[in-house]
Regions:
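Intrinsic-disorder-associated, low-complexity terminal segments enriched in Asp/Asn/His/Tyr and depleted
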Residues: 2-4
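Terminal-appendage/accessory-domain detector
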Residues: 8-140, 242-252, 259-566
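Amphipathic, well-ordered alpha-helical segments in soluble domains
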Residues: 34-37, 146, 169-172, 176, ...
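Hydrophobic alpha-helical hairpins/lids featuring a short glycine-rich hinge
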Residues: 121-174
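Short helix-coil transition sites and intra-membrane helix breaks within transmembrane domains
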Residues: 139-144, 190-195, 230, 331-335
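Well-ordered alpha-helical segments within folded domains of soluble proteins
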Residues: 144-153, 197-204, 251-256, 339-343, ...
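Short connector loops/turns at beta-strand edges and beta->alpha or beta->beta junctions
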Residues: 148, 155, 175-176, 225-229, ...
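Glycine-rich, mobile lid/loop segments that gate access to catalytic sites or pores
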Residues: 155-256, 270, 275
Length: 566
C-alpha cells in the first residue's frame, strides 16, 4: 500500500496532458508517473513525433561525452582507470561493456566506469535547469550529460535495443533529469546535482529491461532513500576522485537498485510525496512555510510530517522540439562552463582587434572580468589564482582565460572569424597538465587579472545566459572591451556559432589522444555519429576499440600508484 493519500490513478486522471507533453501534478505519485512516462516514451506510445533537431542534438551530446571519456582513459586519469579495472573483477555473461573492451561485466560496474571517464575532463554537456516557458521550472539546478552509458549498458544486456531506440532512451533520460533540475534545486540544500540523473537512470534502465512501473517506482524510491549524495565531495579546497565520479557512483547505485527491484525487492513508494524524503523535508508543503533560511523539523508538528503533495509539478515532453536536451549546452574544449562567457569575450576581442592579437605577453598591462554569481564565487575566487591540480585549474577563471590568451599571443595572430579562432585556441587536456599548470607565462598573465561581481544586473541574467564582460588593457593606454556576453559558443541559445564544426574539431582533438591514425578514429566515431541507423547487434559493439593499441601517454597528472593493493 502507498503511504500517502492518493493511490496511483490511471494516467488519464493523474496526468494533465498537453499537445506535446504530460504534467505529473504535485498531488500525484510522481515516481510512478516517471516510470510510466519512461515506459511509454521509450516504447513508442507517442509515435514517431520527435523533431529531427532533437535526434541530432542527442547524437551530438552522446558523441561528445564518449570522446571525453575515452581520451580521459588514454591520458591515464586515476578514477576512470581504477573503476575500469574494477569492472573486470565482476564478469557477467549477460552484462555490459566498458570503453574499449568486448568483455562483459556486471552492468552497474560498466556504468560506473564509463560515466566516471565521461565526466573526468568536466568537458561534456551542461544544463542549468532553467525553462521560464514552463511555470515553476526555473529552479536552476546544475547537471551534466554523464548518463548515456546507462542506455548502452541496458542495450548490451538485452541485445534487443537498436540505435534509434537507444537514442530515444537517451532523450528520455535527459528529459527526466533536466526537468527535475528545473523544479528542485539540490545544491540549495548541499545535495549533489547528480541525484536527478540517478533517478532518471533508474527509470530508463528499468524501462529498457522491461520492468513494470511499480518496479521502477521501487528503484527510484531506493535510489532516493538510500543513496543521496551530499556536496561534501566539493567542500573547501579538498579535491578527490569522488568529485569527478559523483555521477558515476550515484548511477551505479541507481542501476543496482533497478536490478534489485526486478528481482523482487520492494523499495519506498511514492518517494516525491514522502515527508521524510529530501523533497518535502527541505521544501515542506504542509504544516510550515517553505523557507530556505529556516527548515522546521519539529517532530511534534504532525501536519508537517503528514500527507501532502510534492513541492512541484513536473512537465515531461514526449513530442515536438521542446525537449530538455535542446536547452543543454556544449563546451568548446576543456573549461568550467561558468567561464564560457569570458572565453567568448576574449575570442571576440582577439578577432576584432589586431593590435591585441599580435601583441606580446609582456604588452598586457591588466585584464578585468565582470561576472555574475555563482561564477564570481565558484571560479573567480582570488584563491583560485594559485591552482595546484588539474581539477582546481579548470575551475579557475584566471587560469582558463590566461591559458587561452597565452596560446593566442604565442601564435602571433588569430583567424578572421570567431569559429576558426575557437578551433585554433581550443583548450585541451594538455592545457591543464603538470607542465601547463606551472607555466611561468600562464602564471604571469594570471596575476594581471582582476574580477568584479556585476551585481543584480548581471545576476538577474543568469541562468538564462552567462552574463560576462571583459576589458583588456595594453601598456601604452589601449583598452579593448568585449561588452556584455550572454550566449557564448556552445550555449543552447547561441545562434552565431557553427556548432557542428566546433564539435568536429573538439572530437578530433580528443580522438587524437586515443587513436594512432585516422582510420582507427573514423572507425570508432562513425557509428556514434550515425547511431540512429544502427541495428541492435551493432549497438553491442558501439564502445569497442583496441584498447591495447591506444597512443601511449604519461599520466597527465603525474605519477601515481600503478597497481591496486587488493
Amino acid at each position: 500500500p502507498h503511504l500517502y493519500p492518493a493511490v496511483w490513478r490511471p494516467p488519464a486522471a493523474a496526468e494533465t496532458a498537453m499537445a506535446t507533453a504530460i504534467t505529473l501534478p504535485a498531488d500525484s505519485n510522481q515516481a510512478l508517473g516517471i516510470a510510466q512516462y519512461a515506459i511509454d516514451f521509450i516504447g513508442g506510445k507517442y509515435g514517431d513525433s520527435i523533431d529531427p533537431a532533437v535526434w541530432e542534438r542527442i547524437e551530438m551530446f552522446h558523441t561528445d561525452s564518449v570522446m571525453c571519456g575515452i581520451s580521459a582513459l588514454a591520458m591515464k586519469t586515476n578514477a576512470p582507470c581504477v573503476l575500469r579495472g574494477e569492472a573486470f573483477d565482476y564478469p557477467d555473461p549477460r552484462g555490459a561493456k566498458v570503453f574499449g573492451s568486448s568483455q562483459t561485466c556486471a552492468p552497474e560496474k560498466a556504468v560506473v566506469a564509463n560515466a566516471a571517464a565521461v565526466r573526468e575532463w568536466d568537458s561534456n554537456g551542461t544544463v542549468f535547469g532553467y525553462n521560464p516557458s514552463i511555470p515553476g521550472h526555473t529552479a536552476g539546478e546544475f547537471g551534466h550529460n554523464d548518463f548515456y552509458g546507462v542506455v548502452v549498458a541496458a542495450a548490451q544486456v538485452t541485445g534487443k535495443v537498436d540505435g534509434k531506440t537507444a537514442l530515444r532512451a537517451m532523450i528520455c533520460l535527459d528529459e527526466i533529469r533536466g526537468r527535475l533540475a528545473e523544479v528542485f534545486s539540490l545544491k540549495s540544500y548541499k545535495i549533489d546535482h547528480v541525484l536527478h540523473g540517478a533517478i532518471a537512470s533508474a527509470a530508463v534502465y528499468g524501462a529498457l529491461l522491461g520492468a513494470s512501473p511499480e518496479e521502477i517506482e521501487s528503484a527510484i524510491g531506493m535510489t532516493v532513500a538510500h543513496y543521496v549524495p551530499f556536496r561534501a565531495i566539493r567542500a573547501g579546497k579538498q579535491l578527490s576522485d569522488s568529485k569527478g565520479s559523483s555521477a558515476a557512483i550515484s548511477t551505479e547505485a541507481a542501476v543496482l537498485s533497478m536490478r534489485r527491484a526486478m528481482r523482487g525487492f520492494v523499495g519506498p513508494k511514492d518517494i516525491f510525496r514522502n515527508p521524510e524524503s529530501i523533497f518535502r523535508f527541505f521544501e515542506p508543503t504542509t504544516g510550515t512555510p517553505k523557507n530556505q533560511d529556516l527548515i522546521d523539523i519539529t517532530l511534534g508538528n504532525k501536519v508537517r510530517w503528514g500527507p501532502g503533495p510534492s513541492p512541484f509539478n513536473l512537465v515531461l515532453t514526449h513530442s515536438g522540439s521542446d525537449f530538455s536536451v535542446c536547452g543543454m549546452h556544449f563546451k568548446i574544449g576543456l573549461y568550467e562552463h561558468q567561464s564560457a562567457g569570458a572565453l567568448e569575450g576574449l575570442v571576440t576581442l582577439l578577432v576584432q582587434n589586431k593590435a591585441l592579437s599580435t601583441a606580446k605577453l609582456e604588452d598586457i598591462e591588466k585584464m578585468n572580468i565582470v561576472a555574475y554569481e555563482p561564477a564570481f564565487g565558484i571560479i573567480g575566487d582570488p584563491a583560485k589564482k594559485d591552482p595546484k591540480t588539474r581539477q582546481s585549474a579548470d575551475h579557475s577563471m584566471a587560469f582558463i582565460v590566461s591559458r587561452m590568451l597565452q596560446k593566442a599571443l604565442e601564435k602571433g595572430g588569430v583567424a578572421a572569424s570567431n569559429d576558426e579562432t575557437w578551433k585554433a585556441l581550443m583548450l585541451s587536456p594538455y592545457d591543464y597538465g603538470k607542465e601547463a599548470l606551472f607555466d611561468p607565462k600562464t602564471r604571469a598573465l594570471m596575476q594581471k587579472i582582476t574580477f568584479e561581481h556585476g551585481g543584480p544586473e548581471y545576476d538577474a541574467k543568469y541562468p538564462d545566459g552567462i552574463p560576462t564582460s571583459m576589458d583588456i588593457h595594453l601598456k601604452g593606454g589601449q583598452k579593448f572591451s568585449s561588452g556584455l556576453v550572454m550566449y557564448p559558443s556552445g550555449h543552447a541559445r547561441n545562434t552565431a556559432a557553427n556548432l557542428k564544426g566546433l564539435l568536429a574539431t573538439k572530437n578530433q582533438m580528443l580522438g587524437d589522444l586515443v587513436f594512432k591514425d585516422k582510420a582507427a578514429y573514423d572507425k570508432f566515431i562513425s557509428p556514434l555519429i550515425g547511431m540512429k541507423g544502427l541495428s541492435a547487434a551493432q549497438i553491442q559493439g558501439i564502445y569497442d576499440f583496441d584498447f591495447s593499441a591506444m597512443k601511449e601517454h604519461q599520466c597527465i597528472d603525474g605519477e601515481r600508484e600503478p597497481t591496486s593493493k587488493l
